[in-house]
């Protein structure tokens, strides 16, 4: 089976947005107009094609990023649907890792909201070219020009406006196309599938001319010859203008801005045209970078069917009919059904079936090519973020980074039968979602699950009950505190055990230093002259790492520190890897005891949107929760309050906020950083948790 479209006609993109910016509805309309979906599914009726997990249909929020393939203007579009709720930033992060371009959707009333800023920064991190789609212009209070200003003020981006809305709120009926200088009007009776062109309305002619001039000025900056011609009075034609806008978008010089109302079926075809015109193809992206595992040298793969095979597994899902599916982005080479691959873990994996996914239906395929996003069935060892590559020419692509969980709770199975099922369920869920961790409390024997927020854990517990039929008692959520060394310390620690026969001996000299926040655990080996044989060094690192993970003060992990191993001693007979591991464990405990431990807590960035009359109450309440107000800002007839608040003081906040604002305020919150717990609170915690 040959490739259906040449690589330059591929567009791998995602739609990223705040929770209610209409992302799923936009994807639905794209599937409808590209001919894949014959009945439009509305999110608020719980029928959207992309939202295929039961919990998503009930809650009306997108949780898992399903990948879908469709076609437009003889181009092949692979769309990755990303969730907008803050507890699922991990899903967005892994989608961005495998996308070539992104459409940022904004609510036409609110403009750029806090979660939009987070996702935008994630896209900056991966260097993803993007464009903006200002949606919901049919809503009361929608203001396109205000939204464009928020793109400048809150994201620091340079907007290149391509379309202006005709009419606003309930009068919104079409767009002014600035590139082709015409108006586009949609026919409501055809569900937006039909539209016609007409002249730009007379009352918008001046505004259209002003915005078109701005657009041309931005575009000609991309090319000296075009700039010279423009300065001499020659305007670029539509084709030249598009080429210049494409060049600038791919170079991150500006972001094209479109608008519409997906719900009212206006503007989606213009969005699809812009994806084809301005979003990158896999050939516009730099070669994917990695490391050759045989030599440890940097290596790369060109985007080509002829290059050795390389791919990244970016999502694992359990499908009720096929079993475990590994969603994979192929960067180079080709893949056939039944072929063997090498995974990062140096294990051979056989590809059972290869599926092209439409939101919840699937098509079996025999071959896949560079640039494709496919689901593979039958992989046993591969987890999220792993590289798959050809056996003869291995490469390890850069791994994804996953944030540490900030909240935890205990789960106890109700019966013996549930216990076995729960083990299987939790392992499967953890394989799907790297920001979800499972551990056992050594003292109580309880199973502890950890995640990125209350909703995150609530949905996972819900899935455990529904998909795996596990009945369990769930404890109250607890904050995931961390411990941190108060100062640097130099240690000389010996472990010695002589009791007849072979003894145990290990001695290490180390400098243990607290690191920058977020630096993690760093181990440096500077042993000279073989004072400790090389084969024992990994055991020493393991001893420090594992002891730090169990904590010292009240049993929370010690984070962000460096261990510099500079000297030590060993015994020809009595030394072993185990002896040095035990020695390192003792040294870590001694370091914690002598350096002293500070307690750290997760601090959340909270944004509350409230009507003016409740502003005082909202600020007073945040202050009472040990919060620090960062600023307030007027949004239409409401106020947006931004604050940093300890997670420990945010449990149950939603109910209290609703009660004192009569349900008129809403908020969003996401993890920002760890900070030291004040002394009086730390004392209370020690008494409670010790």
UniProtKB/Swiss-Prot annotation:
InterPro entries: EF-G-like_DII, EFG_II, EFG_III, EFG_III/V, EFG_IV, EFG_V, EFG_V-like, G_TR_CS
One Pfam family named in its UniProt record: GTP_EFTU
NCBIfam families assigned: EF-G, PRK12740.1-5, small_GTP
Role noted for this protein: Catalyzes the GTP-dependent ribosomal translocation step during translation elongation. During this step, the ribosome changes from the pre-translocational (PRE) to the post-translocational (POST) state as the newly formed A-site-bound peptidyl-tRNA and P-site-bound deacylated tRNA move to the P and E sites, respectively. Catalyzes the coordinated movement of the two tRNA molecules, the mRNA and conformational changes in the ribosome.
SMART domains attached to this UniProt entry: EFG_C (SM00838), EFG_IV (SM00889)
Presence of the UniProt keyword GTP-binding in the record: yes
Homology family: Belongs to the TRAFAC class translation factor GTPase superfamily. Classic translation factor GTPase family. EF-G/EF-2 subfamily.
Cited PANTHER family: RIBOSOME-RELEASING FACTOR 2, MITOCHONDRIAL, TRANSLATION ELONGATION FACTOR G-RELATED
Family matches, as Gene3D superfamilies: 3.30.230.10, 3.30.70.240, Elongation Factor G (Translational Gtpase), domain 3 (3.30.70.870), P-loop containing nucleotide triphosphate hydrolases (3.40.50.300), Translation factors (2.40.30.10)
CDD domains: EF-G (cd01886), EFG_III (cd16262), EFG_mtEFG1_IV (cd01434), EFG_mtEFG_C (cd03713), EFG_mtEFG_II (cd04088)
Compartments (UniProt record): Cytoplasm
Residues in tr-type G domain copies: 8-283
Any Gene Ontology CC annotation: cytoplasm
Source taxon at top rank: Bacteria
Protein name (record): Elongation factor G
């Amino acid at each position: 089976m040959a490739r259906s479209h040449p690589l330059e006609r591929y567009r791998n993109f995602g739609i990223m947005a705040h929770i209610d910016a209409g992302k799923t509805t936009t994807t639905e309309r794209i599937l409808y107009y590209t001919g894949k979906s014959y009945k439009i599914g509305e999110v608020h009726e719980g029928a959207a094609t992309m939202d295929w997990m039961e919990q998503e249909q009930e809650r009306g929020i997108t949780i898992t990023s399903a990948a879908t393939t469709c076609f437009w203007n003889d181009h092949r579009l692979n769309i990755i649907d990303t969730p907008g709720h803050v507890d699922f930033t991990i899903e967005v992060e892994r989608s961005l890792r495998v996308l070539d371009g992104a459409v940022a959707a904004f609510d036409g009333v609110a403009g750029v909201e806090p979660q939009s800023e987070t996702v935008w920064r994630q896209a900056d991190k991966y260097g993803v070219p993007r464009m903006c789609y200002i949606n919901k212009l049919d809503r009361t209070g929608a203001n396109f020009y205000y939204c464009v200003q928020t793109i400048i003020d809150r994201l620091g981006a340079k907007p290149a406006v391509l379309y202006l809305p005709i009419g606003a709120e309930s009068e919104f009926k079409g767009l002014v196309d600035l590139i082709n200088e015409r108006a586009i009007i949609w026919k409501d009776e055809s569900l937006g599938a039909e539209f016609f062109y007409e002249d730009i309305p007379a009352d918008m002619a001046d505004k259209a001319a002003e915005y078109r001039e701005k657009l041309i000025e931005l575009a000609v900056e991309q090319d000296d010859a075009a700039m010279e011609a423009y300065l001499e009075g020659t305007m670029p034609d539509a084709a030249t203008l598009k080429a210049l806008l494409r060049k600038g978008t791919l170079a991150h010089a500006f972001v094209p801005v479109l608008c519409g109302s997906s719900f009212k079926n206006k503007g989606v075809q213009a969005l699809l045209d812009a994806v084809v015109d301005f979003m990158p193809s896999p050939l516009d992206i730099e070669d994917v970078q990695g490391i050759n595992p045989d030599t440890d040298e940097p290596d790369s793969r060109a985007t080509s069917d002829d290059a050795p095979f390389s791919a990244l597994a970016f999502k694992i899902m359990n499908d009720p009919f096929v079993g475990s599916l590994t969603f994979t982005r192929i960067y180079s080479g080709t893949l056939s059904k039944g072929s063997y691959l090498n995974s990062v873990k140096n294990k051979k994996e056989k590809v059972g079936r290869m599926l092209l996914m439409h939101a919840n239906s699937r098509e079996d395929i025999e071959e896949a090519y560079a640039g494709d996003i496919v689901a593979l069935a039958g992989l046993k060892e591969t987890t999220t973020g792993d590289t798959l590559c050809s056996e003869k020419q291995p490469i390890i692509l850069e791994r994804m980074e996953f944030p540490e969980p900030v909240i935890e709770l205990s789960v106890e199975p109700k019966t013996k039968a549930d216990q076995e099922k729960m083990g299987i369920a939790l392992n499967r869920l953890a394989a799907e979602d790297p920001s979800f961790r499972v551990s056992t409390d050594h003292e109580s024997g309880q199973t502890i699950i950890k995640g990125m927020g209350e909703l995150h854990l609530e949905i996972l517990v819900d899935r455990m009950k529904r998909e795996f039929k596990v009945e369990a008692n769930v404890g109250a959520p607890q904050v995931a505190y961390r411990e941190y060394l108060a100062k640097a310390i130099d240690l000389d620690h010996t472990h010695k055990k002589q009791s007849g026969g072979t003894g145990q001996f290990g001695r290490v000299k180390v400098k243990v230093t607290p690191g920058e926040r977020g630096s993690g655990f760093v181990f440096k080996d500077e042993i000279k002259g073989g004072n400790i044989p090389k084969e024992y060094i990994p055991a020493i690192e393991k001893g420090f790492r594992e002891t730090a993970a169990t904590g010292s003060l009240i049993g929370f992990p010690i984070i962000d520190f460096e261990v510099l191993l500079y000297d030590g001693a060993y015994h020809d007979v009595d030394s072993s890897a185990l002896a040095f591991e035990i020695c390192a464990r003792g040294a870590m405990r001694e370091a914690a005891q002598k350096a002293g431990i500070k307690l750290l807590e997760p601090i959340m960035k909270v944004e509350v949107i409230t009507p003016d009359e409740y502003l005082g109450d909202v600020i007073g309440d945040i202050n009472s929760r040990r919060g620090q107000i960062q600023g307030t800002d007027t949004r239409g007839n409401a106020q947006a309050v931004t604050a940093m608040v300890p997670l420990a003081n945010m449990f149950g906040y939603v109910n209290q906020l609703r009660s004192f604002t009569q349900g008129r305020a809403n908020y969003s919150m996401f993890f920002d950083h760890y900070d030291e717990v004040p002394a009086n609170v730390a004392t209370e915690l020690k008494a409670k948790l010790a």
